[in-house]
Amino acid sequence: MEERNLRKTRVGVVVSDKMDKTIVVAVRDNVRHPLYNKIVKKTYKLKAHDEKNDAKIGDTVRVMETRPLSKDKRWRLVEIMERAK
């Protein structure tokens, strides 16, 4: 159980739930530009496993790194932090 605590976790917003047991999560990150030293907001998308098809578009969710589940899926849904309004 302690090993699971070392896995990466990310918080993001669900942007797609059209696939069966899969959601697409947009994660926002602040990155410093290497030349201009300006903080730039960067968004990247992850495919995550949603076993019960609980998450809907607009929900804020926490995902955790896991073993490869398919070609693109390397994350799984841990919890739904906030439902979409």
From Swiss-Prot:
Tell me if RNA-binding is a UniProt keyword of this record.
yes
The UniProt keywords, alphabetically, are: Ribonucleoprotein, Ribosomal protein, RNA-binding, rRNA-binding
Residue ranges crossing the lipid bilayer per the database entry: none
**CDD domains of this UniProt entry?**
Ribosomal_uS17
Q: Which Pfam families match?
A: Ribosomal_S17
Annotated GO molecular function terms are: rRNA binding; structural constituent of ribosome
User: What PROSITE patterns does the record point to?
Assistant: RIBOSOMAL_S17 (PS00056)
For biological process, the GO terms are: translation
Q: Is Ribonucleoprotein tagged as a keyword? A: yes
Check the record and name the InterPro entries matching this protein. NA-bd_OB-fold, Ribosomal_uS17, Ribosomal_uS17_bact/chlr, Ribosomal_uS17_CS
A GO cellular-component term linked to this record:
cytosolic small ribosomal subunit
- Alphabetized PANTHER family for the sequence: 40S RIBOSOMAL PROTEIN S11 FAMILY MEMBER, SMALL RIBOSOMAL SUBUNIT PROTEIN US17M
What task does this protein carry out? One of the primary rRNA binding proteins, it binds specifically to the 5'-end of 16S ribosomal RNA.
Q: Which family is this protein grouped under?
A: Belongs to the universal ribosomal protein uS17 family.
Q: How does it assemble?
A: Part of the 30S ribosomal subunit.
User: What is the recorded name of this protein?
Assistant: Small ribosomal subunit protein uS17
Species whose genome carries this gene: Agathobacter rectalis (strain ATCC 33656 / DSM 3377 / JCM 17463 / KCTC 5835 / VPI 0990) (Eubacterium rectale)
